[in-house]
């Protein structure tokens, strides 16, 4: 994998099925750490994440902010709130702002344009990353022309049948992938990603994820363990494995050597040193 940067489907399944072997996981982590340090040195990239809304029109079965969750404590930040976060972040040394929210129709496309332009006016040296779900290609283009640099849209699973078990029928796995290709075509630096250990996922599904990422060639890949959320159909499902998530980070680093690979929030949620373990296994963003 380190040499060829891809595997055949059956090779992936064999490798992923061996995740229970601690020596194999440690070997993969050591190789991935060497690759990461060879490409990036010991630098870790720090991002300022602003979660500005947890309203969402979608009803994904795993997500705590799904529209049908009556227990979600909803909030929205104003443009002034967000700009205040950016000001504080800039003073602290953040140079990338990640604006993340649910697919919330309260904010119009024009509002995003104004926000992006204002952040860029105040902090012309910053990078703006958006993570606000599936939109039209025209909307993506408008935001890019306003100054947005990057876009994060997790594909969640590359297996279409698996996708349909985690989302209501009005959501399309094909459309989600089309959004990622449209974002790349427009010129964004693009991030995709998936949950590790989601219900119904096995080596076959993870193999398809690795193949899709190899084909897409994203600039960033965000993965994290599945964490059951209260008030969702998957609330009582088993949490994703820390060991498998760390292993997947290592394999991603070996396949996509120059990709930006975060040690995500969910890793820190399931283990107090989860993020540090992710960095030791090839991640390079927090």
Predicted regions and their residues:
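Generic structural signal for well-ordered alpha-helices
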Residues: 48, 86, 113-117, 140, ...
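Conserved C-terminal portion of the radical SAM core fold
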Residues: 123, 155, 174-234, 242-262, ...
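Catalytic cores of alpha/beta
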Residues: 136-145, 199-213, 268-281
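Conserved, mostly hydrophobic/aromatic
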Residues: 4, 32, 60, 99, ...
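Canonical Radical SAM [4Fe-4S] cluster-binding loop centered on the CxxxCxxC motif
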Residues: 41-81
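Core AdoMet radical
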Residues: 67-82, 89-110, 115-116, 120-180, ...
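C-terminal accessory regions of radical SAM enzymes
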Residues: 1, 7-13, 19, 39, ...
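Flexible, acidic/Gly-rich N-terminal and inter-domain linker regions that tether
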Residues: 1-58
């Amino acid at each position: 994998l380190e040499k060829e940067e891809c595997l055949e489907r059956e090779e992936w399944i064999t490798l992923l099925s061996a995740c229970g072997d601690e020596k194999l996981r440690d070997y993969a982590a050591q190789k991935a750490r060497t690759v990461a340090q060879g490409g990036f040195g010991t630098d870790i990239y720090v991002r300022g994440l602003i979660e500005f809304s947890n309203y969402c029109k979608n009803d994904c079965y795993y997500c705590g902010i799904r529209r049908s969750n009556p227990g979600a404590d909803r909030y929205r930040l104003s443009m002034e709130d967000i700009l205040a976060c950016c000001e504080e972040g800039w003073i602290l040394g953040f140079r990338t702002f990640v604006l993340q929210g649910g697919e919330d129709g309260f904010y119009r496309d024009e509002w995003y344009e104004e926000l992006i332009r204002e952040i860029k006016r105040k902090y012309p040296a910053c990078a703006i990353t958006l993570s606000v779900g599936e939109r039209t290609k025209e909307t993506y283009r408008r935001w890019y022309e306003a100054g947005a640099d990057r876009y994060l849209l997790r594909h969640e699973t590359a297996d279409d049948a698996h996708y349909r078990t985690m989302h209501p029928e009005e959501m399309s796995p094909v459309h989600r992938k089309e959004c990622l290709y449209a974002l790349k075509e427009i010129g964004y630096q693009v991030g995709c990603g998936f949950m590790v250990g989601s219900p119904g996922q096995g080596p076959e599904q993870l193999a398809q994820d690795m193949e899709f990422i190899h084909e897409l060639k994203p600039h960033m890949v965000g993965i994290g363990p599945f964490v059951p959320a209260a008030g969702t159909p998957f609330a009582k499902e088993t949490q994703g494995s820390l060991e498998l998530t760390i292993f997947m980070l290592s394999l991603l680093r070996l396949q996509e050597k120059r990709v930006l690979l975060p040690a995500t929030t969910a890793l820190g949620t399931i283990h107090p040193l989860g993020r540090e373990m992710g960095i030791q296994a090839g991640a390079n963003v927090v």
